Amino acid sequence: MALLQIAEPGQSAAPHQHRLAVGIDLGTTNSLVAAVRSGVANTLPDEDSQHSLPSVVRYTQSGVFVGREAEAFSAQDPQNTIVSVKRFMGRSLEDIQSGEQSLPYVFEASENGLPIFVTPNGKVNPVQISSEILKPLVARAESTLGGTLEGVVITVPAYFDDAQRQGTKDAASLTGVKVLRLLNEPTAAAIAYGLDSGQEGIIAVYDLGGGTFDISILRLNKGVFEVLATGGDSALGGDDFDHMLQAHFAEQWQQGAVSASMIRKMQIEARRVKEALTESSETLATVIDDNGTELTLTVSRVLFEGLISKLVKKTISSCRRALRDAGVSSDEVLETVMVGGSTRVPLVRQEVENFMGKVPLTSIDPDRVVAIGAAIQADILVGNKPESDLLLLDVIPLSLGIETMGGLVEKVVSRNTTIPVARAQEFTTFKDGQTAMAFHVVQGERELVADCRSLARFTLQGIPPLAAGAAHIRVTFQVDADGLLSVTAMEKSTGVQSSIQVKPSFGLSDAEIGNMLKDSMANAKEDITRRMLAEKQVEAARVLESLNAALNKDADLLSEDEQSVIQTNMASLAQIASEDDADAIEAAIEVLDTATQDFAAKRMDNSIRLALKGQSVDNI
């Protein structure tokens, strides 16, 4: 769906002018830029005819180097040569240091706990490093296409959370380029294959790149790409295959404590061996150690497959969960699209074929397919294809909701809801005269706030001081096409409102998302029981609060004996509500209700009598 091009009256909007826009695959290991030229989408090479740009940035006192120029020094200067920066985007320093082994970089923590890399060229963060990768890609595109870009579509893993997506946008802003849209990588691949092959039905997109794995189940129908379910792991990819080989090298060569340069040498050789074993059944690994000694080791494909087997099976488990979430079986999947350089590994293709029951699609270069899809989408968004009816419907990975009394979660937007989306729900006050309400936005599938992830907190002030339950506050959740969330609370009678845009200070890994989903399924029955208990406890508290207010105001309507009966039942309810028996609480509420029916009738009569006092029949 094209963005409207509006001109002032009397001026041409140049409807036939081709507008320049590109798609960028900002990858963990390599990045690419693609454009639609003469109706065909393809990646753009540099002056050396290289299509991919290594996602490597080196900082020195004399300047910043990107791509192959930086990669060439990764072994000699690993401390200042930053690789796979995408894995650090939106994550805390604590998370990185606990999850990543043998990192050669010098880190500092920012005020909010995010990583800062200390380099000879100054201190930089993952957003700034990512912008350095984007700069040569944008320059390449403008040089090749012969003009200034009107915008770019940048791809991100489907499981990138709000912080990671916002970081990607910020990186583009530092580059000085307009982001038309962030596009999920599997969705980009579906665009490329959908337009080329005209497929309709259920499609699985298996995306195994250098540092991330995503599985998406999509329904393609008459130009509509709808993501039914997503899954994956933001810390699993070809880099992990390399790490398994690297660990094997260290063990075989009896490398105990090793230098950063030796680690980097083994990493580089591990990647070369992995790529060689894609075509050959055996290859020779060779590394020169710090003493100048040549170390060699014969590595077979069988050995390599044994090392990575558990990792590959882990991706298949994610595929199984995604199919279950989508409500489809592998038999219903028409095609499986392979994306990412790591899908060239024969074991990966074989395991996917075994699980899906059919040979996966590899007709478009798996390294380029994401960039190609992004280019097609960029071409549409700038208005070069106004006749296109291509529609993208992505989904959110975890439910979004609000904390209510008793620590309960009221889900406002359910998991796997297509985005962009807006959902609204009404809430009310708990106490008489309440003039403010605190909102706690949470993410997750569990029934209690304690078991979900906190996203943000904000307060709505200026609520009219009415009786409990009389004020009406409308809470609206909006998730835009890039997966960013804004929450607005508005008191309906006055129009007073407060809002917040949720940009978490750091991200949530896909492993954690997977664990949250597993926990929600494993604890479903217990969670419902706990929710029912909490709901009854909240109801008991509301009844007691209301009754206390009534007694403070109208106790004179009751005799001492009547007051004693009510207070005895109130004390009983308070005691039972502090225990863990929902049925007993409900029974105690009913007993108290019965005991206060006469009191309620007397209050009603008294209110009517006061309202009619001094009124004649004619005035009524």
From Swiss-Prot:
GO terms for molecular function: ATP binding; ATP hydrolysis activity; ATP-dependent protein folding chaperone; unfolded protein binding. Gene3D superfamilies: 1.20.1270.10, 3.30.420.40, Actin, Chain A, domain 4 (3.90.640.10), Substrate Binding Domain Of DNAk, Chain A, domain 1 (2.60.34.10). It holds the Pfam family HSP70. Belongs to the heat shock protein 70 family. InterPro entries: ATPase_NBD (IPR043129), Heat_shock_70_CS (IPR018181), HSP70_C_sf (IPR029048), HSP70_peptide-bd_sf (IPR029047), Hsp_70_fam (IPR013126), ISC_FeS_clus_asmbl_HscA (IPR010236). Keywords: ATP-binding, Chaperone, Nucleotide-binding. Disulfide bonds: none annotated. PANTHER family: HEAT SHOCK PROTEIN 70KDA. SUPFAM superfamilies: Actin-like ATPase domain (SSF53067), Heat shock protein 70kD (HSP70), C-terminal subdomain (SSF100934), Heat shock protein 70kD (HSP70), peptide-binding domain (SSF100920). This is Chaperone protein HscA homolog. The keyword Cytoplasm does not apply. It comes from the Bacteria. GO terms for biological process: iron-sulfur cluster assembly. HAMAP family: HscA (MF_00679). Chaperone involved in the maturation of iron-sulfur cluster-containing proteins. Has a low intrinsic ATPase activity which is markedly stimulated by HscB. NCBIfam families: HscA, PRK05183.1.
